[in-house]
Amino acid sequence: MAAPQDVHVRICNQEIVKFDLEVKALIQDIRDCSGPLSELTELNTKVKEKFQQLKHRIQELEQSAKEQDKESEKQLLLQEVENHKKQMLSNQTSWRKANLTCKLAIDNLEKAELLQGGDSLRQRKTTKESLAQTSSTITESLMGISRMMSQQVQQSEEAMQTLVSSSRTLLDANEEFKSMSGTIQLGRKLITKYNRRELTDKLLIFLALALFLATVLYIVKKRLFPFL
């Protein structure tokens, strides 16, 4: 059965290897990082945490080495501790180089964006001028349409007034026509009545004349032919 001290040494070595691999992976992420700075800052924070954990485990391993009873095992563990420290220093050097590479890439990217920003600024200025000109043209067109609609409205009002006047004239003419129709109808009635009266007068005259002639004939008859 393994001694507790040997188990602790084994765990320390496993943790040291794990943290070393995690640090290397984060350093590679920093090399590949192209920004922004906030992402680089976040990666560096993670690297610092891993270095702290790695350093703590190396110190634990070193303490365990010093507590070994056998000198040979002690020297072997101290050699492992020294190798881990060298590897940690190498990782720190790689970390600094990766930061320099990343910051240089971010600076170059920012310069390129500034240059593109100048072109973009000129393009936006040109676009604004074009939009302003287009807006002015549209405004003039809308004003022209507004004037045209105003003229059409005025013409419509004049046409409406003319229509109202014509309607009033037609109504007046209709009233006059109704009045004339009444007058004509009254005249027709009077003429009909007059014609009837004239016929009656003629008939009376004819009857009076016939009566007169009959009377004359009767008198002549009595004078000339008394025996009849």
UniProtKB/Swiss-Prot annotation:
Could you tell me the keywords of this UniProt record? Apoptosis, Coiled coil, Endoplasmic reticulum, ER-Golgi transport, Membrane, Mitochondrion, Protein transport, Transmembrane, Transmembrane helix, Transport, Ubl conjugation
- Ranges in the topological domain labelled Lumenal: 221-228
Q: Which residues lie on this side of the membrane: Cytoplasmic?
A: 1-199
Q: Name one GO biological process term.
A: endoplasmic reticulum organization
| Location(s), subcellular | Endoplasmic reticulum membrane; Mitochondrion membrane
The UniProt entry lists membrane topology as: Single-pass type IV membrane protein
List the transmembrane segments.
Answer: 200-220
Output a single Gene Ontology CC term carried by this record: mitochondrial outer membrane
Spell out the coiled coil positions from the record.
37-90
* Major location category of this protein: endoplasmic reticulum
InterPro entries in the record, alphabetically?
Sec20, Sec20_C
Report the superkingdom from the record.
Eukaryota
Briefly state the modifications made to the protein after translation: Polyubiquitinated. 'Lys-63'-linked polyubiquitination by RNF185 increases the interaction with the autophagy receptor SQSTM1. Undergoes 'Lys-29'- and 'Lys-63'-linked polyubiquitination by RNF186 that may regulate BNIP1 localization to the mitochondrion.
* Pfam families tied to this protein: Sec20
* Gene Ontology molecular-function annotations: calcium-induced calcium release activity; SNAP receptor activity
Subunit annotation: Component of a SNARE complex consisting of STX18, USE1L, BNIP1/SEC20L and SEC22B. Interacts directly with STX18, RINT1/TIP20L and NAPA. Interacts with ZW10 through RINT1. Interacts with BCL2. Interacts with RNF186. Interacts with RNF185. Interacts with SQSTM1; increased by 'Lys-63'-linked polyubiquitination of BNIP1.
Role of this protein: As part of a SNARE complex may be involved in endoplasmic reticulum membranes fusion and be required for the maintenance of endoplasmic reticulum organization. Also plays a role in apoptosis. It is for instance required for endoplasmic reticulum stress-induced apoptosis. As a substrate of RNF185 interacting with SQSTM1, might also be involved in mitochondrial autophagy.
Q: Which family does it belong to?
A: Belongs to the SEC20 family.
**What protein does this entry describe?**
Vesicle transport protein SEC20
